[in-house]
């Protein structure tokens, strides 16, 4: 990997993350790299400025923060194919990030990257678009939105909790009308986030699939469904025309959906590219360590394992 054009992103408002970002920037500049640095957070989005400022392709994005900072990087950089080195600095769970211990000797990290001594993990993304008009002549409304974890469709109100009534269609066939708090359309990566909290299945991030999960449905028969990756999921809000439904991407507000409009969710035509520094990365170990995944309450010794 060449390190000619690098962006360094730190978690907004986090002093430790900012200090590591400044150190990384200085070292990369000493190696001759052109470096752009900026904060990322709920009120800070450095990526439009980054994209408008660079004069050559971005070789690397160093993202110092937690999972939220990494998700934002994936949403903005996947379409450009930028490799992301996400490091858990100032984060909490760190499900998508490399441990800080592997980043403390940054000079050694830059050497490894230049010698291509790392693994690249590609993760499926989602894209969503709001449409209005007839099915025969749909008109796109607003932007196209991207997510690494999930798209969430649920109503919003400032003064009361609203029950959603959503109709879902898959590849042109009406599946059901859901009554509850909303619907999740997730990637395998997102299956271990909001989806698993809503009693959805866990999918390995190395596969490509969609999983649709009702949020607190008012029916015992409403169950999650796993779909082929090329499926097209369309969701209509029904009932109250005075209320709008919100589309959320990875927990961030994307746009509003009004009755008469629908949101179409499909697999994106790009993937998030995460750099893995760990020698023995294990998804199952991550589940055990980060999500406290456990089976038997009493551990038993396996005498048959060599």
UniProtKB/Swiss-Prot annotation:
A Gene Ontology molecular function term of the record: NAD binding
Catalytic activity: NAD(+) + ATP = ADP + NADP(+) + H(+)
GO terms for biological process, alphabetical: NAD metabolic process; NADP biosynthetic process
Gene Ontology CC terms: cytoplasm
Coiled coil regions, renumbered to chain: none
Chief place of localization: cytoplasm
Family of this protein: Belongs to the NAD kinase family.
HAMAP family tied to this protein: NAD_kinase
Chain's role: Involved in the regulation of the intracellular balance of NAD and NADP, and is a key enzyme in the biosynthesis of NADP. Catalyzes specifically the phosphorylation on 2'-hydroxyl of the adenosine moiety of NAD to yield NADP.
Protein name stated in the entry: NAD kinase 1
Species whose genome carries this gene: Thermosynechococcus vestitus (strain NIES-2133 / IAM M-273 / BP-1)
Gene field: nadK1
